[in-house]
Amino acid sequence: MLTRALNDLKNPKSKTVSLQIIATFTGTTGSMGFVTGQRYELIVRYIRSRGRFEVKTRDGQLFCPYQSTEAFAKNWSASAIQKGA
């Protein structure tokens, strides 16, 4: 579900501009300020000019770039995904 939504966001033919995701961080605590096991409301955008995903918390406090869908999916477990945040 998560990988599919990210790939759709990355697709140049997609009309989806961003995703709003409720997810639990499964990466290492301290990585860009995120805490393992903590749930976050995220806004994810794919920046074509940089070739990467940019993830920020809805409140704008935390930010992390990801080069691939695999890298993002490795660090997050999504419980809800909504297009067009």
Question: What is each residue range found by the language model?
Answer:
Residues 1-20, 24-28:
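Mixed-charge, Lys/Arg-rich low-complexity intrinsically disordered regions
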Residues 5-9, 57, 73:
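Intrinsically disordered, low-complexity peptide-like regions
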Residues 20-21, 42, 80:
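Generic short N-terminal amphipathic or hydrophobic helices
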Residues 24-68:
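Basic/aromatic-rich interaction segments and small domains that mediate binding to polyanionic partners
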Residues 61-85:
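Intrinsically disordered, low-complexity, charged/polar segments
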